């Protein structure tokens, strides 16, 4: 009877452990290969001959280490010998063999390494003994399976995500869109992974099904996939007795993944080839981070921007989950790993932890958290095994010992497709970890059919009661990366969603979209011992948002446990968008020791600083909240914004344009003024503007070149979507907002580098026009200048002002 692939893999794992230390060709090669045959159920010692006498190409006598006529030739060497020489030696034996005896596979081996050559194709693959279980399909003919053609497989990476994206685009262009398209892509993703990881048996069943059971022009691929999905959703005992045997070999998957009947997709030759091309990749090596990249590469750019999606590297995800729970769990394990009773209780604790991401996207945070929890569980099992009476046993059935499962993980995602990706991603990483355990303990196992499922809800997190997904009393940790959208970038629907959460909070109109998750998390965690941590744009700890958000967090009795101060957050997707972020961990409990992660370089690693308290500005200081103030606390001049052109560039000139205009129209020189935006002031560059405040309409019309520019301003303003700008097209010779003082003033750029010790300031006379990228202090004195350039004022500014990315944003409030 032919062994199934799971049994073969289990035997291969045990074989790898048994022969891990073998090295001597003379004494150990023969028992090594006899044991190797038993992996495939071959116990008859006479199928192959050891030390077969053969004549080499030059007529000299040689000895083939192992020969199975028509099937296999092996040249074996002691550990560490040159395999290239061994290959040449093995090929040299073939010249004088009868054609009927020529082997299908030639294998050279030194105990630690294998090199397998497929003689029909000439292709070769190398692997190490410890990875034999991954390559058993190459030896399928030994167990009665057809020869598995060797393919060079590239690891799945961002290119694979983009390849799936092209398939998505082709299907969409053919008219296959919406929900059906999204579900189809998720199913294909699962099938590609299952084909390379032992879920589908034999390996590459999915690829073979497409190649052998569908037409090359793709005309019946849609119906073929529909039939396959139906089989994957039907238990083996309930399948039709006359089912195609190639379909019947696919395992029942369950998990409701293949439950819904989809409309049939129409494929072309190119689309079928694209799917087969994807089959050629090594999906067993998929990184959990790929799912965010996959989603991002196939989403519409506009939709991605509107959702504020940021798909993140594992390094950045670990910045959040390590201080939230992982470091503490690892420390506890190190304390108790020598005590079996305590290990048992700790393992029980791991099984009971729950994780909730209320803005889970494609599930990156949940996937990495699950993987790390399973890695820790593996350490627990290894430590327990080493303390048990079974220490030294090569194969251990651990299937009943694995307790951590995907049903401990919960999420909310507003879009259907990423919600589906998140669920499948957790199943896939679960299978990856099961393979890790299989290698560790020498016995293959897989959790198929899918019994447990993650609790991912497709819903609007700002409108759903989170307790419907996971009751707060059952939640251990809340975590994630909610969308970052400043007030000016929020859609009307998003503003309404946020208003539903913050309607009773004074001043909430200034809040970033992400603040809705902070406030809902605080309400959710109130009165519990659970903890939360979110990645956020750094603006929530700067400027006018601070008093509003953190005042509410104080009212809800939240305490900050740890914080990463501003750093540059990058993602794994195309374009690698960089955002300046913070991470804030908080909860209802107030731990005695807290941690602040500081960054000398926002692109570099942090260093941890122990703190007694962490305030709203993420420093170890009293939690004083500075509210927005419109009226100064003492008698000082008002700080106002500079004048705003809203001209499309037509009223502004560089030096060459100024000279050309004066040459063409000398009378225009009277109306040209020096113009200072923030860039011109900071970098000492020259710019000019047409300042036609006192120029009559008649005089403007007498200057045709000036009139062309005025007309361009008019057209630009009329084309605007802003109603006030359209109205102001009627005064197109003027800046839209005129705030120029009639006296000298102190110019203050709104944005300047965080690397400066102080905000750059400068005195200007009233003839120099100040642009709206600056603020102005009219009638300023040296006293005002001294205060604003003082170390005290700039220290205050650095910790409390708003920022653009990491640059200082200086305002008049």
Per-region residue spans from a language model:
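A short, conserved, highly charged catalytic patch centered on acidic carboxylates
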Residues: 1-105, 119-122, 147, 733
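Preference for the N-terminal adenyl/adenosyl cofactor-binding alpha/beta module
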Residues: 2-18, 129-372, 408, 412-421, ...
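C-terminal substrate/ligand-recognition segments
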Residues: 310-327, 355-356, 366, 741-753, ...
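Flexible phosphate/Mg2+-sensing switch loops adjacent to catalytic phosphate-binding sites
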Residues: 47-50, 204-207, 332-351, 373-407, ...
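Signature of N6-adenine DNA methyltransferases within the class I
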Residues: 22, 56-62, 79, 83, ...
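Short, ligand-facing micro-motifs at secondary-structure edges
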Residues: 565, 752-768, 786, 795-808
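Amphipathic alpha-helical
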Residues: 702-734
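Metal-dependent nuclease catalytic cores in nucleic-acid-processing enzymes
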Residues: 33-38, 89-106, 394-395, 425, ...
């Amino acid at each position: 009877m032919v062994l199934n692939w799971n049994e073969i893999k289990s035997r291969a794992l045990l074989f790898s452990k048994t022969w891990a230390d073998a090295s001597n060709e003379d004494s150990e090669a023969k028992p090594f290969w006899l044991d190797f045959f038993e992996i495939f159920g071959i116990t008859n010692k006479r199928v192959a001959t050891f030390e077969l006498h053969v004549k080499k190409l030059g007529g000299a006598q040689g000895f083939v280490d192992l020969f199975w006529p028509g099937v296999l030739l092996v040249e074996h060497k002691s550990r560490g010998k040159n395999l290239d020489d061994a290959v040449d030696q093995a090929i040299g034996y073939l010249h004088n063999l009868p054609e009927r005896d020529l082997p299908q596979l030639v294998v050279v081996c030194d105990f630690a390494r294998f090199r397998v050559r497929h003689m029909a194709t000439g292709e070769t693959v190398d692997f190490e003994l410890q990875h034999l279980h991954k390559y058993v399909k190459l030896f399928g003919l030994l167990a009665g399976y057809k020869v598995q053609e060797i393919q060079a497989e590239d690891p799945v990476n961002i290119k694979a995500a983009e390849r799936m994206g092209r398939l998505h685009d082709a299907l969409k262009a053919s008219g296959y869109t919406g929900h059906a398209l999204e579900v189809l892509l998720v199913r294909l993703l699962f099938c590609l992974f299952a084909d390379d990881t032992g879920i589908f048996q034999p390996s590459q069943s999915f690829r073979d099904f497409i190649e052998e059971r569908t037409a090359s022009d793709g005309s019946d691929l849609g119906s073929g996939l529909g039939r396959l999905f139906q089989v994957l959703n039907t238990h083996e005992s309930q399948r039709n007795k006359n089912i195609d045997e190639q379909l019947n070999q696919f395992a029942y998957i369950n998990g409701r993944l293949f439950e819904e009947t989809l409309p049939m997709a129409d494929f072309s030759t190119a689309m079928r080839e694209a799917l087969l091309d994807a089959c050629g990749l090594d999906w067993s090596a998929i990184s959990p981070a790929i799912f965010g990249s996959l989603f991002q590469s196939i989403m519409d750019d506009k939709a991605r921007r509107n959702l504020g999606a940021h798909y993140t590297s594992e390094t950045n995800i670990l910045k959040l989950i390590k201080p939230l729970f992982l470091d503490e769990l690892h420390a506890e394990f190190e304390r108790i790993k020598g005590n079996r009773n305590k290990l048992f209780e700790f393992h029980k604790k791991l099984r009971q932890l729950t994780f909730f991401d209320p803005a889970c996207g494609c599930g990156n945070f949940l996937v990495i958290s699950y993987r790390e929890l399973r890695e820790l569980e593996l350490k627990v099992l290894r430590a327990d095994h080493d303390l048990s009476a079974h220490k030294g046993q090569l194969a251990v059935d651990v299937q009943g010992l694995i307790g951590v499962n995907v049903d401990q993980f919960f999420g909310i995602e507003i879009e259907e497709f990423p919600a589906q990706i998140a669920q499948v991603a957790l199943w896939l990483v679960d299978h990856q970890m099961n393979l890790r355990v299989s290698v560790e303990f020498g016995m293959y196992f897989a959790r198929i059919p899918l019994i447990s499922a993650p609790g991912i809800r497709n819903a609007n997190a700002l409108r759903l009661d989170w307790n419907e997904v996971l009751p707060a009393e059952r939640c251990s940790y809340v975590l994630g990366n909610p969308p970052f959208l400043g007030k000016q970038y929020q859609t009307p629907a998003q503003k309404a969603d946020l208003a539903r959460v913050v309607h009773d909070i004074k001043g909430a109109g200034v809040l970033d979209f992400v603040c809705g998750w902070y406030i809902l998390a605080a309400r959710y965690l109130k009165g519990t011992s659970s903890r939360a941590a979110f990645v956020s744009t750094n603006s929530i700890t700067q400027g006018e948002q601070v008093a509003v958000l953190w005042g509410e967090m104080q009212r809800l009795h939240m305490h900050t446990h740890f914080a990463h101060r501003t750093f540059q957050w990058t993602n794994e997707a195309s374009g690698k968008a960089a955002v300046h972020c913070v991470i804030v961990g908080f909860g209802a409990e107030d731990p005695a020791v807290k941690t602040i992660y500081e960054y000398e370089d926002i692109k570099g690693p942090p260093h941890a600083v122990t703190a007694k308290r962490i305030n709203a500005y993420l420093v170890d200081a009293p939690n004083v909240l500075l509210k927005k103030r419109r009226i100064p606390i003492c008698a000082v001049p008002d700080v106002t914004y500079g004048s705003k052109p809203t001209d499309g560039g037509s009223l502004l000139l560089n030096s060459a344009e100024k000279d050309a205009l004066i040459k063409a129209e000398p009378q225009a020189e009277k109306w040209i003024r020096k113009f200072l935006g923030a860039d011109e002031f900071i970098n000492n560059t020259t710019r000019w503007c047409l300042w036609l405040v006192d120029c009559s309409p008649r005089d403007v019309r007498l200057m045709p070149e000036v009139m062309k520019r005025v007309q361009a301003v008019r057209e630009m303003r009329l084309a605007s979507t802003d109603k006030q700008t359209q109205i102001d097209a009627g005064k197109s010779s003027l800046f839209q907002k005129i705030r120029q003082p009639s006296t000298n003033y102190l110019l203050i750029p709104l944005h300047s580098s965080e690397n400066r010790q102080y905000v750059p300031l400068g005195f200007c006379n009233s003839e120099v026009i100040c642009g709206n990228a600056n603020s102005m202090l009219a009638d300023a004195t040296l006293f005002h200048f001294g205060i604003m350039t003082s170390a005290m004022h700039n220290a205050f500014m650095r910790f409390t002002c708003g920022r653009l990315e990491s640059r200082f944003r200086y305002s008049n409030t």
